[in-house]
């Protein structure tokens, strides 16, 4: 498939660009940070996104969605990278929707997907338990007790966990913390007895949550998918999430480049525009070339998921690893080429590095995905 957008996808991209420029410009990052928002994002923005149909893009048409695919959705996530827009788009409309439509039963799909699409329901994934992403190693236990399960354990770095109505909890239904076949997913109401949520403000101003489960009782019907068989679909959806994170990082790379290029054309030093200095020209040219490669890498990975390509997992790790690398290059170069003013809070360029670093770490950093790719290749 050609690495170009369809007319409809390009229209969605332009629509997202215009909407975010009007309703969520980069200056809103400072406003949300200074307001110390409990949600970690503008609570008035998400309903507007839902009105734009963004909550329904990955939802099948039979459940009130648009079914526009990952390539379409990524045009939005890329633009949110350009404007640093915080929202539950990733946790709710991408990860949760993808898991439910892939392994949910008919009742779960009909009950949950229309509500997510309409903005009535907020969900997120609770998976990580340590400071490093490792979906294979799950220590949280789900003990079977008749027709019920009792959950005990903790989850860290749960994105939008403080605002979600329900959690998709990854737990172990056997005793071996390294056994992939013993992982089960549960849909858990966050208000159940025994659940405690501790909000943490991250460097980008968004929320991360630490959630404790102490003898939390859930029903067998709350299992998402099949008992003991949650790892494979979970891994697939984590790949999808990582490609969308790569798309967001691509937006960050492009915006930092564009802003820095304008600065190089305006800032004078030693009587000359600094953009005329050959050393900076070479660095900028290398930076631009890397971004162009990233565009193709991300689009190819997105197309692979929409086409059910067997190589999708490989391509997801390539995309995330590459964008982690170039996002680091982009944010570092942006600050360095801006000089001292790039380090000041009054200048917006510093906000991009503060968002890029958490996005790079979420669901596996550069090293994690390089190792994952190498392992899949037999090394």
Regions inferred by a protein language model and the residue ranges of each:
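Alpha-helical interface subdomain recognition
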Residues: 1-87, 95, 103-107, 115-120, ...
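Flexible, small-/acidic-enriched active-site or ligand-binding loops
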Residues: 137-139, 189-220
């Amino acid at each position: 498939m050609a690495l170009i957008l369809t007319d409809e996808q390009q229209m969605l991209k332009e629509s997202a660009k215009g909407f975010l420029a009007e309703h969520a410009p980069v200056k809103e990052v400072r406003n949300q940070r200074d307001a110390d928002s409990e949600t970690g994002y503008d609570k008035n923005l998400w309903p507007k996104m839902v009105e734009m149909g963004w909550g329904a893009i990955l939802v099948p048409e039979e459940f009130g969605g648009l079914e526009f695919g990952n390539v379409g959705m990524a045009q939005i996530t890329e633009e949110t990278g350009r404007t640093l827009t915080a929202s539950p788009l990733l946790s709710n409309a991408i990860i949760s929707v993808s898991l439910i439509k892939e392994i949910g039963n008919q009742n779960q799909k009909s009950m949950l997907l229309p509500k997510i699409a309409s903005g009535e329901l907020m969900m997120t994934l609770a998976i990580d338990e340590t400071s490093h992403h490792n979906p294979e190693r799950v220590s949280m236990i789900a003990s079977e007790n008749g027709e019920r399960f009792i959950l005990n354990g903790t989850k860290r770095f749960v994105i939008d966990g403080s605002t979600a109505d329900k959690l998709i909890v990854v737990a172990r239904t056997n005793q071996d913390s390294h056994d992939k076949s013993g992982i089960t997913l549960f849909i858990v109401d966050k208000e159940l007895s025994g659940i405690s949520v501790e909000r943490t403000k991250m460097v980008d101003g968004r929320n991360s949550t630490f959630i404790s489960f102490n003898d939390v009782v859930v029903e067998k019907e709350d299992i998402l998918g099949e008992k003991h068989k949650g790892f494979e679909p979970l891994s697939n959806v984590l790949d999808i999430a990582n490609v969308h994170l790569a798309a967001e990082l691509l937006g960050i790379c492009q915006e930092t480049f564009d802003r820095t290029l304008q600065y190089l054309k305006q800032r004078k030093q030693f009587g000359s525009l600094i953009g005329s200095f050959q050393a900076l020209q070479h660095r900028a040219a290398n930076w631009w070339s890397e971004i162009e490669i990233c565009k193709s890498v991300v689009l190819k990975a997105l197309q692979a998921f929409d086409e059910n390509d067997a190589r999708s997992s490989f391509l997801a790790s390539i995309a995330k690893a590459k964008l982690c690398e170039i996002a680091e290059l982009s944010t570092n170069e942006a600050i360095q080429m801006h000089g001292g003013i790039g380090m000041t809070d009054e200048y917006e360029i510093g906000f991009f590095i503060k968002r890029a670093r958490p996005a790079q770490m979420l669901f596996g950093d550069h090293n994690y995905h390089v190792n994952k790719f190498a392992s899949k290749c037999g090394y």
